[in-house]
């Protein structure tokens, strides 16, 4: 009975992971099909850099250590800037 339950839960977890990965690939392919002009992509990059550096500066003003803002969508905060992972 326990083995059956473990097998069902394992299959469910694998199914969820594959579904999530498939949705990400579909979203990427739709973005590539529609396409964004380079200027729009540059604006998005600049916004991410600005958001990350401003959040650190605001936190430093309160005499606290800078806790870097988490960047989303495959970006991470490094040296007060969001960089692509």
Curated annotation (Swiss-Prot):
Which GO molecular function entries does the Swiss-Prot or TrEMBL record give? Answer: toxin activity
Which compartment or compartments is the protein found in? Secreted
Indicate where this protein is primarily found. secreted
Signal peptide bounds: 1-22
Q: Which is one Gene Ontology cellular component term of this protein?
A: extracellular region
- Keywords recorded for this protein, A-Z: Disulfide bond, Neurotoxin, Postsynaptic neurotoxin, Secreted, Signal, Toxin
Q: Give the top-rank taxon of the lineage listed in the UniProt record for this protein.
A: Eukaryota
Q: Which residues form the propeptide?
A: 23-48
Question: Which PROSITE patterns does the record match to this protein?
Answer: HWTX_2
Tissues of expression: Expressed by the venom gland.
Keyword Secreted in record:
yes
Tell me the disulfide pairings in this chain. 52-66, 56-77, 71-82
Coiled coil ranges (UniProt) are none
Similarity annotation: Belongs to the neurotoxin 12 (Hwtx-2) family. 02 (Hwtx-2) subfamily.
Known role: Neurotoxin active on both insects and mammals.
Instruction: Provide the assembly information.
Output: Monomer.
Query: What protein am I looking at?
Result: U4-theraphotoxin-Hhn1a
Q: Which organism is it from?
A: Cyriopagopus hainanus (Chinese bird spider)
